[in-house]
């Protein structure tokens, strides 16, 4: 490792003991291994495609099948993506890295070994800063250490439900490039573990190096869990394997913590084991114990030369890196005046952040808070309801900005803007950037701002609602709101609310 991280990471090893995170008097210690598939078009050592969802054994080459006489050739795109990740987590980079063979037998591993990086990984020590949410109004920042991240090839997949009574092997996934990310044992609760996993997931998608679709197996997590009394030596750890949803990760860790506490409280000992989580029964159970563990007998792969990376290559990749989530979040707070919460939501994905900035670019920067409210509330709410991503938004950034401009110049009230937004979402204005203006014109949604016209409506409402007027003059403030509502109803929501309030007060007081 000979490329230093850009920021000091001495804080990685330091832990603030948080007694509020103890469970029944035990401190929880968690370390995490993440297997993330890299989104290259071809596999790490062959030209076979990496597409997901094809018929079994149609995406495997002779290299992936481990046929005699074939040699692996390293995919340069895999190296570039790994370097991006290393830069993104402030890590030391292995400008000299090598590949090793991890030897074990399993039906979905045709060569009888997996090519990985044991001795000299491409990414060394680094860290990632996260925000941990331990419940309502209980958030805190924490720096999580990363031990290393190394390249390796994925294995195939055993298929248990294709033929009754038999297990098949699908080698489409064999040879798909992986980066395995190994954390320090820095997490002290399931919430902290989940915050770390989500931060890594956000980073790899933000950098564009992985689609990280957990349901497709392109982002898989193994969690090492142990417990101890405060100040004691580390306890015996167990490993929760192949957790593939955020919801199950948190539940599985909590169930395993409870299981280990029950064992120790009953006077027993936790046995080092690989665990499975059963979501239907909401429990963890032993898959195999330490005695069953493999001796992988690592040794250097003789078919692959060491990888030597020029510093110029690293500098070029670093220069082309997008602004990272933490930096963008800070800029949204400092330059645009957004709250920490708003900035965090708007940097939840690179696509959301880009969309928001595209909206702000079309309006006055001072109105960034208004844009944030519409993007976070109305737009993301509608998209989530329809199970869509921001890239599938039926409203373009320029169209939303056009609607916000009409709010700003008083063409639209907030209530009318909701109607225009709904029409935009249903694509009533088509693809044109000025779709909001077309909808306002066609549907007659322009706000009434003529003082004389509004005053006439107010006078008519006062004349028809004498009882409510007397209640207001008698000191019942709620009656005033009732009169405002009657004016808005009479104007079909088009009257400017501020002018309605002003004129109504002038006529009643």
Swiss-Prot record:
Q: Name one Pfam family in it.
A: GatB_N
**Which InterPro entries does this one have?**
Asn/Gln-tRNA_amidoTrfase_suB/E, Asn/Gln-tRNA_Trfase_suB/E_cat, Asn/Gln_amidotransferase, Asn/Gln_tRNA_amidoTrase-B-like, GatB, GatB_C_1, GatB_Yqey_C_2, Gln-tRNA_amidoTrfase_suB_CS
Q: Does the keyword Nucleotide-binding apply?
A: yes
Matches recorded under SUPFAM superfamilies: GatB/YqeY motif, Glutamine synthetase/guanido kinase
GO terms (BP aspect): glutaminyl-tRNAGln biosynthesis via transamidation; translation
The EC code for this enzyme is 6.3.5.-
Query: What GO molecular function terms would the record report?
Result: asparaginyl-tRNA synthase (glutamine-hydrolyzing) activity; ATP binding; glutaminyl-tRNA synthase (glutamine-hydrolyzing) activity
Can you tell me where the transmembrane regions are? none
Swiss-Prot/TrEMBL catalytic activity: L-glutamyl-tRNA(Gln) + L-glutamine + ATP + H2O = L-glutaminyl-tRNA(Gln) + L-glutamate + ADP + phosphate + H(+); L-aspartyl-tRNA(Asn) + L-glutamine + ATP + H2O = L-asparaginyl-tRNA(Asn) + L-glutamate + ADP + phosphate + 2 H(+)
Enzyme superclass (EC): ligase
What are the record keywords, sorted? ATP-binding, Ligase, Nucleotide-binding, Protein biosynthesis
Its assembly, as annotated, is: Heterotrimer of A, B and C subunits.
Belongs to which family? Answer: Belongs to the GatB/GatE family. GatB subfamily.
Q: What does this protein do?
A: Allows the formation of correctly charged Asn-tRNA(Asn) or Gln-tRNA(Gln) through the transamidation of misacylated Asp-tRNA(Asn) or Glu-tRNA(Gln) in organisms which lack either or both of asparaginyl-tRNA or glutaminyl-tRNA synthetases. The reaction takes place in the presence of glutamine and ATP through an activated phospho-Asp-tRNA(Asn) or phospho-Glu-tRNA(Gln).
Q: What is this protein called?
A: Aspartyl/glutamyl-tRNA(Asn/Gln) amidotransferase subunit B
Q: Which organism is it from?
A: Psychrobacter arcticus (strain DSM 17307 / VKM B-2377 / 273-4)
Instruction: Report the gene name.
Output: gatB
